[in-house]
């Protein structure tokens, strides 16, 4: 066959290659494709190596665009991360002012003492009710019974809940108001 008589053969379809009698041909085609791909990659690598050895200038694209730094020294002069302007988020603006003063040296770190809550606020929150609950736990049965008896004496022997208190206040309001009676309509003769 001469070059002019050669017929260009298209690749066989995948369904035809999946048939049992065509499996050998399929393996041959796959190995040829893998060899071609490998040859192209080898050629590209040799071209790149030749360019790199021939050129004396440093490629600008090889410079790193990102810099990874594990040292905090470069991050010292950063501003507070959250921003708010024009009173849209007042809490964030207060934090911005605080960190700005801290950075400028107007405030010192020792002013904070690492406490989130002042001593006065802590005393108020842990005050009366919580201490009373702790005292109640440490009381004996006799002491608790005596305290309940005292409470019953002041309330008249009744235990009140919220509904009872509401009814009592509603009854007091009605007692103060003038009594309303049903009035018969006037007879017009």
Swiss-Prot record:
Which parts of this chain are annotated as the region Disordered?
A: 124-161
Checking InterPro entries in the record gives: MPP6 (IPR019324)
- Indicate, by first and last residue, each region the UniProt record lists as having compositional bias (Basic and acidic residues): 133-161
Which example biological process does GO assign this protein?
maturation of 5.8S rRNA
Q: Which Pfam families match?
A: MPP6 (PF10175)
Family label: Belongs to the MPP6 family.
Q: What is this protein called?
A: Protein F29A7.6
Q: Organism source for this protein?
A: Caenorhabditis elegans
At the highest ranks, the source species' classification is: Eukaryota, Metazoa, Ecdysozoa, Nematoda, Chromadorea
